[in-house]
């Protein structure tokens, strides 16, 4: 019986040793993935920052030359302003992304009329759009009260609409809102633009994934949209079957028990 006891102890210790080795290997792989992700992030950040910084440096130097005419001076100033705004957006996007990932971004939930918010967003996008496409809002609803962070919800809608304007020179861009079920609202942004290739759709919400490498942007916008929507209790996706452009959809919960409630998370 003593021999059987020792055999049992040895088997149990061997099992624990194997489990410990497996756990150590898992931790090692997680650490390696974390290092790779951080290195890729820093590499992409360096590339994205370098482009506007080079423009700021180069065109600022041109402005110091006394021989340039007023038209050239104006063009240089415009380029400097555009790249300053791009650099600021990149910094803000990185701050937002980091805050969301570590749970440091504060969400202030209060009752908001989603229909009114959508109309305000359309008005804002109409004023800043750089396209001939019509920007529209469509809904069968007179109003729809949501317990949400209106600023963050607005941020997502503006991001999706501005993305659509970059790839829709003609035609239309439509923001639609409907009540999908008793407890779920469905938002969608549909455009008649160039669309998104199937191979890109699967990784469209990845960091630094750009729809067009030649277009200005940080490549972080859709990642931020996804994280915000998840914090609001919904989910976001691209419609793989829509072929006349692109269509992004996301859900938002309607919680009747929370009517009249305000909170910070």
Residue ranges, per PLM feature:
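Short alpha-helical segment of the dimerization/phosphotransfer core of two-component systems
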Residues: 29, 82-87
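Short conserved segment of the HATPase_c
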Residues: 196-208
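Primarily the dimerization/phosphotransfer
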Residues: 23-65
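Conserved catalytic submotifs in the C-terminal HATPase_c
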Residues: 108-113, 132-144, 180
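Helix-loop junction within the histidine kinase core
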Residues: 98-109
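Short alpha-helical Gxxx[C/S/T] motif in the catalytic ATP-binding
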Residues: 221, 225
């Amino acid at each position: 019986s003593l021999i059987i006891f020792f055999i049992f102890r040895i088997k149990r210790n061997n099992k624990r040793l194997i489990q410990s080795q497996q756990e150590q290997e898992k931790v090692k792989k997680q650490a390696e993935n974390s290092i790779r992700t951080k290195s890729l992030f820093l590499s992409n950040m360096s590339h994205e920052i370098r482009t506007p910084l080079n423009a700021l440096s180069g065109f600022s130097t041109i402005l110091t030359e006394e021989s340039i005419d007023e038209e050239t001076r104006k063009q240089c100033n415009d380029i400097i302003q555009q790249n300053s705004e791009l650099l600021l957006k990149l910094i803000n996007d990185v701050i937002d992304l980091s805050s969301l990932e570590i749970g440091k971004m504060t969400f202030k939930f209060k009752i908001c009329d989603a229909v009114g918010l959508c109309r305000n967003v359309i008005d804002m996008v109409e004023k800043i759009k750089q396209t001939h496409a019509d920007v529209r809002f469509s809904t069968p609803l007179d109003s729809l009260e949501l317990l949400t962070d209106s600023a963050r919800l607005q941020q997502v809608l503006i991001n999706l609409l501005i993305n659509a304007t970059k790839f829709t020179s003609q035609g239309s861009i439509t923001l639609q809102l409907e009540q999908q079920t008793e407890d779920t609202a469905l938002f969608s942004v549909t455009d008649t633009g160039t669309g998104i290739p199937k191979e890109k759709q699967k990784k469209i919400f990845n960091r630094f994934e750009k729809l067009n490498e030649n277009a200005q942007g940080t490549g972080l916008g859709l990642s931020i949209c996804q994280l915000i929507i998840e914090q609001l209790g919904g989910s976001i996706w691209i419609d793989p079957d829509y072929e006349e452009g692109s269509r992004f959809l996301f859900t938002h919960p309607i919680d009747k028990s929370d009517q009249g409630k305000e909170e910070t998370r």
